[in-house]
Amino acid sequence: MKDLTMLLDELKDMSFFNKGDICLIGCSTSEVIGEKIGTVGSMEVAETIFNALDVVSKETGVTFAFQGCEHINRAITIEKSQYNPLTMEEVSVVPDVHAGGSLATYAFQHMKDPIVVEHITVPCGIDIGQTLIGMHIKHVCVPVRTSVKQVGQAIVTIATSRPKKIGGERAKYQ
């Protein structure tokens, strides 16, 4: 997928991926192939996307988390090494193509030691196909603009975050 490679290269050039961070991926493989979200799914597309992200992870030190679909309440597949019991709650579900989505399913099958958590708060994310990842992005969510607007037929939305500005008119900010 040339557009995926271009998108990831552009984000690397922008220093979007930071070593030690967790970047959330939401993806409708149905949308990537031009179908309605949640209808046909593609493990082949999931494999391509997962493998491209794995390369980015090795190059930059970022870790990826994978959002499941609404049928599993948009739960997140992560490596167990990223699990923090103080801020995350593990849930008992295994993503499936028809309840979790193809990419979360593929990730669960190919990660070293995957677990699924109910919620996560991450500093950045890539939404491929309007899967609504915003509920897992740290406040304050900030859109990131790139020249790549789609992966396949799916609309891409990218977000990062910044600290909240609090204190009112007398406050000073960095």
Swiss-Prot record:
Native source organism of the sequence: Staphylococcus aureus (strain NCTC 8325 / PS 47)
Family: Belongs to the UPF0340 family.
Superkingdom of source: Bacteria
Stated name of the protein: UPF0340 protein SAOUHSC_02355
